[in-house]
Amino acid sequence: MGLPKLSTPMRSAGSAAPPVCRLIALLLCTATGVPAQITPVAVGPIVLVVSDLDRAETFYTQVLSFRTAATREAHEYSFDRLTGVFGTNVRVATLELGSESIELIEYRTPRGRPVPPDSKSNDQWFQHIAIVVSDMEAASARLFQFHVQPISTAPQTLPEWNLNAAGIKALYFRDPDGHPLELIYFPPGKGDPRWHQGQGKRDGPFLGIDHTAIAVADTERSLGFYRDVLGLRVVGESLNYGAEQDHLNHVFGSKVRITSLRSSSGPGIELLEYLTPRDGRPSPTDTKVNDLWSSQTTLIGREFPASVQELLKRKVEFISPEPQETLPLGEKGARGVLIRDPDGHFILFESASDYHER
């Protein structure tokens, strides 16, 4: 399948607020204490849209050692309002690996479109989760044992001249629906210290989720959103290029500006700007949240009404016409809104009233 036909241009983060935003403003007009900047509590689960929940759950649990924590079904009008997709009937599974979790969602109705088979790592709908491993050779051998579709030619070790990333080993591959995933190994002195603690307590090499990475067209524009609006902090930067990078992401001649952001807990978010080549395609402007390429990131924040007011003030693009209960996604009792970043990536901004450390 080629790219879906593009429709109207995507609204940038600085354009006029759409009618749904004006409706939210009316609903939240009594909020006080609007923060100058949102302070997120955590980056929550990454949500992957799958075509067959049973198949996807089997892949993640049997191949990658995730554990199924919960499954549920829903066909609520409130979920239609949250997602901007009418007539939803969904199945959701929450899967855990270490301290992190992902949510797999199958839209039984309406069915979304598949991931374009010619998708590349520099296309701007690209989003992966990075799974930390204690032993790259053992982890990659397990993938090959299950005939997993690779993106990388083989596991790559980043070169010594790249001081911020030297010695890190990584491998890109795909799940059964074509979602890109990454295995990542941190040598001593690199990565979060927790990845080097208690590794012997796990049966296999898969430890947890370090970050989700998204392709962006302009790092500075994206920092204006993720750092300046959403309140994430920059914790690292790197410029990756050379044969190892080309073979890792399977993009010839790639020079990638990588910016790492974090909240107080949960996985990080990495911005990937391909300085070369510049032929990555923008996300289709008619993308819906049930399309399989439309992964979404959960961001959990306090002072929810005031934070939503701040998003409105910053003219962020809203999908939800007003805050809704997020179930079957997220925490029980949580409310949220679905928004888009400047490149079209979806974010579920969720209230933190019932949040607890995962």
Give residue ranges: language-model regions.
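Bacterial N-terminal signal peptides
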Residues: 21-33
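Vicinal oxygen chelate
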Residues: 37-38, 41-51, 71, 90-104, 108-109, 115-207, ...
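Short consensus segments that form the blades of beta-propeller domains
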Residues: 83-85, 118-121, 162, 203, ...
